[in-house]
């Protein structure tokens, strides 16, 4: 990796090239052509054009980036000397959760890290929320971090004040593991490295950045960092959100991608957008992180349980098609849902006739 580091830095930060364009190229040379990134950069322009169908503008931008290789080689050496590591998207050390959630179009081509890289492979929980969070939101954050630690899950946060900082501090307090996702280049985080030196050395904190190592903090980098926090996590908990900002946009984007996101149910007197996010499809949870079912959902759950009992009782008396069952029990289920339920029951036998029929299995001595 050390020999290739300069090439990865060069490719990952070509001005104007987004993740989709970079990753598509990486797939083509590393998987389809089965060559290294160094071999790719050594190809003549004619081969770039022939093998990868690159436009003249792309080739011009690649050549401009290639001219910066000596500077990036020096930067790569400096990173190594200072204990930083690079994880390209092709590496088995790259977070599989991040890759699965962001895919080709949005996964960063290169991660800069410092700390225990194994943390990237563990089950993880992101706790997100407002910089100016209320006391109850911070208490919620503490509970979720404690629960995650107890379940041996890594806590992912973004190192902003408020919920982010509370999540990190709580994970440390409960002797858990954390990932800090930076809104800046990893070489500009010197104060943070001093603060969390012990936890980093002990293997409990991993620092991650996707930006150029020397990039200073910027508001736009903080916004670009937020999707990385969400994507590094298997579970997402929202302590508090307004109707604008990074937390709101991150949750909306996650819901659009069909991710299950847990949002703290606010008290009636609170002024935040948590209820709006729940209305949009997020799962309401209490201050301990337990799911809250509203009265209508509880009623449906009870009704379904009653139907299930009646189905099993009916099938003890003979063979029935799904239509027969629905009609006799006056159920509002679809046939496909009923079939799925019947297939999942060990005590139900399927009779292979047209149409299929179902009946209760005769018990044996060892049932």
Each model region followed by its residue ranges:
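Short, positively charged patches
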Residues: 1-139, 146
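Glycine-biased, small-residue-rich flexible motifs in mid-sequence functional cores and linkers
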Residues: 1-5, 89-367
């Amino acid at each position: 990796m050390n020999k290739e580091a300069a090439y990865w830095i060069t490719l990952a930060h070509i001005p104007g090239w987004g993740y989709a364009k970079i990753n598509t190229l990486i797939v083509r040379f590393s998987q389809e052509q089965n060559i290294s990134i160094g071999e790719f950069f050594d190809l003549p322009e004619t081969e770039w054009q022939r093998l990868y169908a690159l436009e003249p503008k792309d080739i011009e931008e690649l050549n401009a980036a290639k001219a910066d290789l000596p500077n990036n080689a020096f930067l790569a050496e400096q990173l190594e000397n200072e204990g930083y590591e690079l994880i390209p998207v092709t590496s088995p050390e790259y977070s599989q959760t991040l890759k699965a959630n962001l895919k080709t179009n949005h996964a960063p081509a290169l991660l800069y890290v410092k700390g225990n890289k194994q943390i990237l492979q563990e089950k993880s929980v992101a706790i997100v929320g407002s910089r100016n969070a209320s006391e109850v939101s911070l208490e919620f954050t503490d509970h979720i971090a404690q629960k995650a630690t107890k379940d041996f899950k890594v806590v992912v946060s973004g190192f902003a004040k408020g919920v982010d900082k509370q999540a990190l501090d709580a994970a440390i307090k409960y002797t858990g593991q954390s990932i800090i996702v930076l809104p800046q280049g990893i070489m500009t985080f010197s104060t943070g490295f001093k603060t969390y030196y012990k936890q980093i050395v002990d293997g409990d904190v991993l620092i991650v950045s996707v930006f150029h190592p020397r990039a200073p903090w910027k508001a736009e980098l903080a916004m670009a960092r937020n999707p990385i926090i969400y994507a590094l996590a298997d579970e997402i908990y929202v302590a508090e959100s307004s109707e604008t900002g990074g937390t709101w946009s991150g949750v909306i984007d996650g819901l659009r991608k069909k991710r299950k996101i847990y949002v703290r149910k606010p008290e009636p007197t609170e002024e935040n957008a948590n209820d709006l996010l729940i209305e949009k499809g997020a799962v309401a949870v209490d201050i301990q992180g337990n799911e809250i079912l509203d009265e209508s959902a509880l009623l449906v759950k009870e009704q379904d349980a009653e139907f299930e009992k009646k189905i099993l009782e009916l099938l003890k008396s003979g063979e029935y098609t799904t239509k027969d069952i629905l009609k006799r029990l006056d159920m509002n289920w679809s046939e496909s849902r009923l079939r799925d339920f019947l297939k999942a029951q060990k005590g139900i036998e399927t009779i292979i006739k047209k149409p299929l029929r179902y009946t209760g299995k005769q018990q044996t001595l060892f049932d």
